[in-house]
UniProtKB/Swiss-Prot annotation:
It is found in: Membrane. This is Suppressor of tumorigenicity 7 protein. The chain crosses the membrane at residues 15-35, 62-82, 512-532. The keyword Membrane applies. Keywords: Glycoprotein, Membrane, Phosphoprotein, Transmembrane, Transmembrane helix. Belongs to the ST7 family. It comes from Callithrix jacchus.
Length: 585
């Protein structure tokens, strides 16, 4: 019964929509017929006579005031439309027309197949939008105590936003905690410490967790019925407490490395114990997964400490071993740390080997992947590249490949070239980035600018070719060339990730639509004419009559036609014979 009732309502709705679409002319004539029949009771003739008498008594000042009032209202609407466009990036009138008026006027297709297809398309686009606007952990993030806090001490500015630090707190709770933490006092304290907003409270909680592990517990072991001995047993160290102290309390990279080494000893022991018990139940499996994340994080940060302290080869070895030991943990993006370290060693063959593995169509892209591939191809031709020579003889195959790689990288993240070419000042990278956004561009350029400078001519090639990308994608928000359309949400997310003193790079730049500019000019011109006509009616009448006489005069028409013909002749001018023979030779 319910399905029959629903089907009847759908049929009734479709009939009403069809009647509005095709029978509106019949309805219009019916209304006119009713008005004609009821003209005597409604006194339509008398009302029309009254209206005509009222219009005949109006003075020109009324029309001037009416024009000024309409211009004022149009100006207010224009201001509101401009504000709405600046804030939300779309026209309010257009949005209301498409979202609300179009369905009421029958602009929605009722075919079930079309609806299903459109819903599938919308879900795909929404899914793509969500994946594009996902915030990722920065694989090259700095140390809070040794780097971010030192910047704050020197400049007095906060390089991290609250939103960024809140995301880091959520990551720490996901990676470093599990449901069984309440069974161990130190882990229970650290579970609360990761939720603390105050840095000093977090550091104090980490020290408290380490102090609990120093308490010695006595275990009574009966040997015989008449005697016992006491065994002194130390509780295992808390690895996550050392991680927090290394990240936030250590003021130098050397101190952080020392604390991470202590964390490695504790974390390795916990990992081995949980590895043996992981098959005993879901609780032990979750604990082993947590211990695995802790161990991988510690080893990765130790490799980054070695990279910061100049031991680059040691850092590369640690990263390679870590990727071999845990090949499935791609959430940390260790290969991007490896690429940066290999570029520092100028081991370009090894960089190409890593790119061959990770620059795959099925894997998610990043600015590091795309721009490193462009750097390697630019390195082969950049030292001999000259824009003048290329314009004369054309691009060679290698140069064309390099230019295409640069265009591919710029399409993925168009903000990076401004930082590599030092057209925009760099800041400390955030702890989280948005792929294809300004935050990712800052994180990439902060570490890779030196590698581009080291390759002779690479920045020159980038400077000459990167803007050509935008000619291939005139509407980047609607259609891309090699990637999906550029996501709309990057500006909003980057403003939350980057500090307020940084000017966020916006792509594509929002330009006011032509109808807003045209409406602004028309309203301003009309209001000015109304004001001048109200103040100087006789003078404006003479001016209007003179302008009409000028436009209607024969001299004006002849001059306009001559100017048009002269311009066409200039455009179609044929070069002299000598010059044509020179080009033929």
């Amino acid at each position: 019964m319910a399905e029959a009732g629903t089907g009847f309502l759908e049929q009734l709705k479709s009939c009403i929509v069809w009647s509005w679409t095709y029978l509106w002319t019949v309805w219009f004539f019916i209304v006119l017929f009713l008005v004609y029949i009821l003209r005597v009771p409604l006194k339509i003739n008398d009302n029309l006579s009254t209206v005509s008498m009222f219009l005949n008594t109006l003075t020109p000042k009324f029309y001037v005031a009416l024009t000024g009032t309409s211009s004022l209202i149009s100006g207010l609407i224009l201001i509101f439309e401009w504000w709405y466009f600046r804030k939300y990036g779309t026209s309010f009138i257009e949005q209301v027309s498409v979202s609300h008026l179009r369905p009421l006027l029958g602009g929605v297709d009722n075919n079930s197949s079309n609806n299903s297809n459109s819903s599938n398309g919308d879900s795909d686009s929404n899914r793509q939008s969500v994946s594009e606007c996902k915030v990722w952990r920065n694989p090259l993030n700095l140390f809070r105590g040794a780097e971010y806090n030192r910047y704050t001490w020197v400049t007095g500015r906060e390089p991290l936003t609250y939103y960024d630090m809140n995301l880091s707190a959520q990551d720490h709770q996901t990676f470093f905690t599990c449901d069984s933490d309440h069974l161990r006092p130190a882990d229970a304290i650290m579970q609360k410490a990761w939720r603390e907003r105050n840095p000093q409270a977090r550091i104090s909680a980490a020290h408290e967790a380490l102090e609990i592990n120093e308490i010695r517990s006595r275990v009574e072991v009966p040997l015989i019925a008449s005697s016992t001995i006491w065994e002194i047993k130390l509780l295992p160290k808390c690895a996550t407490a050392y991680i927090l102290l290394a990240e936030e309390e250590a003021t130098t990279i050397a101190e952080a490395e020392k604390l991470f080494k202590q964390a490695l000893k504790a974390g390795d022991g916990c990992y081995r114990r949980s590895q043996q018990l992981q098959h005993h139940g879901s609780q032990y499996e979750a604990q082993h997964r947590r211990d695995t994340n802790v161990l991988v994080y510690i080893k990765r940060r130790l490799a980054m400490c070695a990279r910061r302290l100049g031991r680059t080869r040691e850092a590369v070895k640690m990263m390679r071993d870590l990727m071999k030991e845990f090949p499935l943990l791609s959430m940390f993006n260790i290969h991007e740390n490896l690429l940066e370290a290999l570029l520092e060693l100028q081991a370009y063959a090894d960089v190409q080997a890593v790119l061959a593995k990770y620059d795959d169509i099925s894997l998610p892209k990043s600015a590091t992947i795309c721009y490193t591939a462009a750097l390697l191809k630019a390195r082969a031709v950049s030292d001999k590249f000259s824009p003048e020579a290329a314009s004369r003889r054309g691009l060679s195959t290698a140069e064309m490949n390099a230019v295409e790689a640069i265009h591919r990288a710029v399409e993925f993240n168009p903000h990076v070239p401004k930082y590599l070419l030092e057209m925009k000042s760099l800041i400390l990278p955030p702890e989280h980035i948005l792929k294809r956004g300004d935050s990712e561009a800052i994180a990439y350029a902060f570490f890779h600018l030196a590698h581009w400078k080291r390759v002779e001519g690479a920045l020159n090639l980038l400077h000459c070719t990167w803007e050509g990308t935008f000619r291939m994608i005139p509407y980047p928000l609607e259609k891309g060339h090699l990637f999906y359309p550029y996501p709309i949400c990057t500006e909003t997310a980057d403003r939350e990730l980057l500090p307020s003193f940084h000017e966020v790079s916006v792509y594509p730049k929002k330009e006011l639509p032509f109808f807003i500019l045209f409406t602004a000019g028309l309203c301003s011109f009309t209001a000015m004419l109304a004001l001048l006509t109200h103040q100087f009616p006789e003078l404006m009448g003479v001016f209007a009559k003179a302008m009409i006489d000028i436009f209607c005069s024969a001299e004006f028409r002849d001059w306009n036609c001559k100017s048009i013909f002269m311009r066409v002749e200039d455009e179609l001018e044929i070069p002299p014979a000598s010059q044509s023979q020179h080009f033929q030779n």
